[in-house]
């Protein structure tokens, strides 16, 4: 089957301000010369891959991966390959990212996950999630995953977001074991496999608010396996005063000390989702030959990762009593490859 192209090669037209271009140069090694050469090399690589049956070659799409990997060609191609594989192998999580889908529309309307209208003091968009708005008796793990991926993919359409990265606020008030128990062991394993550096995002500031003490043990175990660099980006806040020291309070929803109500933030975010809807649905046309098991397809990525120490993944088992039979935490996620934590509950 000859490779098809959904969006072909285009001439890059920079939409970044001078300020953001300087951020890209300093943080991502991006210059006009580097960018032009890198785009050509990745496009050449995509065209040479027989497993990629339907591709995008436009600059906006390819630059997501280059910027994530600071224009390291090999690493960018590896992440792109994995991204395409995950989209095709797990369509219930990565496809039909339609803001008009009843479940997704309901989750957005209830304020489970939305993006604040204004950028923070670092120029980043702020992704806001409220666990209390997710009813584990009504929604599925697929609904949860698609809601998050729909949010990420919509934001990545904007190249300033690709450069700046993202700030997160997770309000964990009312989160309980019932939120975790909807995940089967195989789904948890699959979820972390999917997120193993597959989404081209820069996670810059991660804030947890109202984390229940019952969840703090799991949080601390997962956090302890991260590198110091990543751990430094995690912040826990017992109250609004602490959160407001990390995120400009004027940007937060009114219910959190800001100016704009949650309802207004949701309305604004819905408009953005609608504006990006067609491009998101077009992503479903991407296609790779996913006949080989995920482990085989991604072995090269793991082996060659510049973050891999070469010692393999160490598995740690810790016994708990509780309602969940098995919970897997992998600090791969979007972060450097490290060891895994296996919680047997």
What are these regions (language model features)?
Residues 1-345:
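Basic, amphipathic alpha-helical/coil surface patches used to engage anionic, phosphate-bearing ligands
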């Amino acid at each position: 089957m000859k490779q098809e192209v959904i969006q072909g090669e285009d001439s890059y037209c920079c939409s970044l301000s001078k300020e953001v271009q300087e951020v890209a140069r300093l943080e991502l090694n991006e210059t006009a010369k580097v960018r032009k050469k890198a785009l050509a090399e990745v496009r050449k690589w995509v065209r040479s891959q027989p497993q990629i049956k339907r591709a995008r070659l436009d600059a906006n799409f390819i630059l997501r991966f280059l910027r994530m990997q600071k224009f390291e060609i090999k690493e960018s191609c590896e992440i792109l390959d994995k991204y395409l594989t995950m989209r095709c192998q797990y369509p219930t999580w990565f496809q039909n990212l339609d803001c008009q889908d009843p479940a997704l529309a309901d989750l957005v309307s209830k304020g489970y996950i939305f993006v604040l209208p204004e950028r923070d003091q670092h120029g980043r968009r702020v992704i806001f999630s409220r666990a209390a708005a997710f009813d584990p008796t009504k929604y599925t793990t697929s609904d949860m995953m698609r809601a998050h991926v729909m949010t990420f993919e919509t934001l990545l359409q904007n190249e300033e977001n690709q450069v700046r990265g993202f700030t997160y606020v997770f309000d964990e008030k009312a989160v309980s074991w019932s939120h975790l128990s909807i995940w089967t062991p195989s789904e948890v394993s699959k979820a972390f496999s999917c997120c193993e550096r597959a989404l081209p995002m820069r996670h810059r500031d991660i804030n947890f608010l109202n984390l229940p003490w019952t969840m703090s043990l799991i949080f601390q175990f997962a956090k302890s396996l991260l590198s110091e660099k990543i751990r430094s980006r995690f912040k826990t806040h017992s109250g609004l005063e602490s959160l407001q020291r990390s995120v400009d309070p004027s940007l937060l929803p009114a219910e959190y000390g800001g100016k704009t109500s949650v309802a207004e933030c949701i309305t604004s975010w819905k408009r953005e989702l609608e504006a990006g809807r067609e491009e998101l649905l077009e992503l479903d046309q991407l296609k790779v030959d996913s006949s080989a098991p995920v482990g085989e397809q991604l072995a090269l990525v793991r082996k060659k990762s510049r973050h891999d120490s070469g010692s393999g993944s160490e598995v740690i088992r810790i016994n708990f009593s509780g309602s969940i039979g098995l919970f897997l935490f992998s600090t791969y996620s979007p972060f450097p490859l490290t060891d895994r934590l296996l919680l047997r509950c």
